[in-house]
């Protein structure tokens, strides 16, 4: 089991309250299966994995925001493409 020093993670994020929000957001991403862990899982819980990623500087609130925006844009593009294909098929 990996030892996580929360103080190191707090220093990366700025304060402990934002750390809780970022770690929870990242843990949900990993738990839902939509995202792979960026550090070796080593049989750790998703919350520990999220904290380790933050501690190593791999995840920040800004990084999560950018990734989510990219995913939304990709999803919208796919939806537009699907609608266009359906519309062209009806002609």
UniProtKB/Swiss-Prot annotation:
GO terms for cellular component: cytosolic DNA-directed RNA polymerase complex. GO terms for biological process: DNA-templated transcription initiation. It catalyses: RNA(n) + a ribonucleoside 5'-triphosphate = RNA(n+1) + diphosphate. It holds the Pfam family RNA_pol_Rpb6. It is an enzyme of class 2 (transferase). Gene3D superfamilies: 3.90.940.10. One of its GO terms (molecular function) is bacterial-type RNA polymerase core enzyme binding. InterPro entries: DNA-dir_RNA_pol_omega, Pol_omega/Rpo6/RPB6, RPB6/omega-like_sf. Coiled coil: none annotated. Keywords: DNA-directed RNA polymerase, Nucleotidyltransferase, Transcription, Transferase. It comes from the Bacteria. Its EC number is 2.7.7.6. Promotes RNA polymerase assembly. Latches the N- and C-terminal regions of the beta' subunit thereby facilitating its interaction with the beta and alpha subunits. The RNAP catalytic core consists of 2 alpha, 1 beta, 1 beta' and 1 omega subunit. When a sigma factor is associated with the core the holoenzyme is formed, which can initiate transcription. NCBIfam families: rpoZ. Belongs to the RNA polymerase subunit omega family. This is DNA-directed RNA polymerase subunit omega. It comes from Yersinia pestis.
């Amino acid at each position: 089991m990996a030892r996580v020093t929360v103080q190191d993670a707090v220093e990366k994020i700025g304060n402990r309250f934002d750390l809780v929000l970022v770690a929870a957001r990242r843990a949900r991403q990993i738990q839902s299966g939509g995202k792979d862990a960026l550090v070796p899982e080593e049989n750790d819980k998703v919350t520990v994995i999220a904290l380790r990623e933050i501690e190593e500087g791999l995840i920040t609130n800004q990084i999560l925001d950018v990734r989510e925006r990219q995913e939304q844009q990709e999803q919208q593009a796919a939806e537009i493409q699907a609608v266009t294909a359906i519309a062209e098929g009806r002609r």
